[in-house]
Design a protein with these regions (language model features):
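Terminal targeting signals and extreme-terminal segments of soluble enzymes
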Residues: 1-159
Length: 159
């Protein structure tokens, strides 16, 4: 048995999304993950696949929380490309994400004090909110140019 990701994944990525180039470490274990960067907003996303699910074929709560950490924390690094760590997350589960559903998430910085950022976030499938919450993230340093996500993306639409 291999833990390599396969094109199961023969699903269609929604317009505007790019595959995140996270092919090793923890990103590989939970992926594939995607992002959409618009002029005034960003979103991260994933398709619920079997390796994300529990016995009820819903995305495990731990997967949703991990995804929230990545989606909400990204709000800290969107303009300054900063490395950050999670200090605290408070999450409210409101619904489940089922096998085969496209899950999206984003966050908004609502407070910054020194190197601490408070982010309010939401995770959803279509019109259904899966989770809301708040994260506190601590900036640890500026990312080196080679480690900045925008330079390592693989585009779905030739861009």
């Amino acid at each position: 048995m291999s833990d390599e990701l396969t094109p199961s994944q023969s699903h269609v990525i929604p317009e505007g999304y790019s595959l995140l180039n996270w092919h090793r470490g923890f990103g590989r274990q939970i992926g594939p993950l995607y992002e959409h960067n618009g002029p005034t907003e960003y979103r991260r996303a994933f398709l619920v696949e079997e390796h994300h699910t529990n016995g009820m074929m819903n995305a495990r709560g731990g997967m949703i929380m991990t995804f929230a950490d990545m989606a909400w924390g990204h709000a800290v690094s969107t303009s300054d490309s900063l490395w950050w760590v999670t200090v605290r997350m408070t999450c409210d589960f409101l619904s489940s994400a089922r096998l085969g559903e496209w899950v999206e998430g984003s966050g908004e910085v609502v407070l910054q004090q020194d190197d601490l950022y408070t982010v309010r976030g939401r995770i959803w499938c279509g019109d259904r909110t899966i989770m809301t919450g708040t994260g506190i993230f601590k900036v640890i340093e500026q990312r080196p140019i080679a480690a900045r996500p925008s330079l390592n993306k693989v585009s779905n639409h030739g861009g």
